[in-house]
């Protein structure tokens, strides 16, 4: 069985397209879909109950955040394979079947994602990432990565120097689509939880990828197939607030995994503060008021 876990937050407008794109049977396996709704008052629950009665709908008592809600959905799931999926995605059966077959026949793969394509046809760069070095982070914040996207010296953060249609191992993938075996998620879990609930919204996917890799598994991007990611529909659009939240969450991931010494903690705090301030300074110069895809 494949279990699909979706965390919804003010997702009434896009959840229908997401659920409508999901099969109930895939490669001979039954598919169960679980929606954990962090904002049950927006009407998404009524839509799901009326149009998708096969979906297991869980109304959260409050906004649990991304990681905690995913953990609740995971606990309710039964599948040998589990897909964590965003509500602002539109999937297709060939892409799902391809990724599932790759996972089924290669036990070294811990997590896999297809290419994620945005509404304008461009690639969602966050669907394949490195575990960035300090230099990679500076290049992205300072705009060098976007200015020289095909140069490996500057493009290490989002790996834009690699072919979009290729298949290769990466450092991290996006929480919008994370497919893995239950045995892998259980092996990478901390205190019985797949996602670290200290990360309310951002950084949790990076943290999980690091733990899966530490458990001895590969993180794979397969660009031969693609799904649509209507990025940002379920989150706030204020550039400053979101940028600060992303940088601060990723800083905390680095402190968790790489900040064993006082010197390392000082280094990462300083680096992430610099990256955040440089990125916000560039945004103000360009007059951004809405979130750019990253």
Residue positions per predicted region:
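Active-site-adjacent helix/loop segment of glycosyltransferases
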Residues: 210-292
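Conserved donor NDP-sugar-binding/catalytic core segment of glycosyltransferases
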Residues: 90-126
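Short, acidic, metal-binding catalytic loop of nucleotide-sugar glycosyltransferases
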Residues: 20-30
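Short aromatic/hydrophobic "clamp" motif used to bind/position activated sugar donors
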Residues: 82
